[in-house]
From Swiss-Prot:
Keywords: Cytoplasm, Hydrolase, Protease, Serine protease
PANTHER family listed in its UniProt record: ATP-DEPENDENT CLP PROTEASE PROTEOLYTIC SUBUNIT (PTHR10381:SF70)
Protein name: ATP-dependent Clp protease proteolytic subunit
Biological processes, Gene Ontology terms: protein quality control for misfolded or incompletely synthesized proteins
Description of how the protein assembles with itself and partners: Fourteen ClpP subunits assemble into 2 heptameric rings which stack back to back to give a disk-like structure with a central cavity, resembling the structure of eukaryotic proteasomes.
Function as written in the Swiss-Prot or TrEMBL entry: Cleaves peptides in various proteins in a process that requires ATP hydrolysis. Has a chymotrypsin-like activity. Plays a major role in the degradation of misfolded proteins.
Active-site residues, record numbering mapped to chain: S102, H127
Stored PROSITE patterns: CLP_PROTEASE_HIS, CLP_PROTEASE_SER
Transmembrane segments: none
GO cellular component: cytoplasm; endopeptidase Clp complex
Catalytic activity, reaction form: Hydrolysis of proteins to small peptides in the presence of ATP and magnesium. alpha-casein is the usual test substrate. In the absence of ATP, only oligopeptides shorter than five residues are hydrolyzed (such as succinyl-Leu-Tyr-|-NHMec, and Leu-Tyr-Leu-|-Tyr-Trp, in which cleavage of the -Tyr-|-Leu- and -Tyr-|-Trp bonds also occurs)
Subcellular location: Cytoplasm
UniProt main location, coarse: cytoplasm
Length: 204
């Protein structure tokens, strides 16, 4: 999560000991809300992982709310978030606002079953993993990377099939090309459990 300081509002709280200033994201962290905004990178993933571990240490029995607005990004960085979501004790509820594409969609689907949400105008996109940055070098090296990419593709498809309650063949077919979905379509597919029109519609 990377925000320019001049764009981040500061919240002033009054207490018996005077005023205390928080940036808005630190204030929301107190409410157990974690954001993934923008591409999934090593830096953004490390911030999310650190916040998840911190919130577990604060209260291992209280849900964490993971808000996602991401076009996707690094598979290895995303898997560090995924593994941490499963490693910690609290349930992690996921919510898509804006978009959850590629690794963003994978993380959205990985929330606690029954606690995966999207706002009405969200867009979700699934596809097969990509090689980023262009791949060059010897033919044998390219072959090694191609085999690794196929292994990653199979693993992601198997995991997402489990989270969506679908057959592996469905994921292999439906991720072959960019596959865009509305919130309604994502719910039907099994990527989310509920569409939230407003806070009052939150049920779990």
């Amino acid at each position: 999560m990377s925000f320019d300081n001049y764009l981040v509002p500061t919240v002033i709280e009054q207490s018996g000991r005077g005023e205390r200033a928080f940036d808005i994201y630190s204030r929301l962290l107190k409410e157990r809300i974690v954001f993934l905004v923008g591409p999934v990178t090593d830096e953004s993933a490390n911030l999310v992982v650190a916040q998840l571990l911190f919130l577990e240490s604060e209260n291992p029995d209280k849900d964490i709310f993971f808000y996602i607005n991401s076009p996707g990004g690094s598979v290895t960085a995303g898997m560090s978030i995924y593994d941490t979501m499963n490693f910690i004790k609290p349930d992690v509820s996921t919510l898509c606002l804006g978009q959850a594409a590629s690794m963003g969609a994978f993380l959205l689907s990985a929330g606690e079953k029954g606690k995966r949400f999207a706002l009405p105008n969200s867009r979700i996109m699934i596809h097969q993993p990509l090689i980023s940055g262009g791949l060059g070098g010897q033919a044998s090296d390219i072959e090694i990377h191609a085999r690794e990419l196929l292994k990653i593709k199979e693993k992601l498809n198997r995991l997402m099939a489990k989270h969506c309650g679908r057959d592996l063949a469905d994921l292999e077919r439906d991720t072959d090309r960019d596959n865009f979905m509305s919130a309604e379509e994502a719910k039907e597919y099994g990527l989310i459990d509920q569409i939230l029109e407003n806070r009052a519609s939150l049920q779990f």
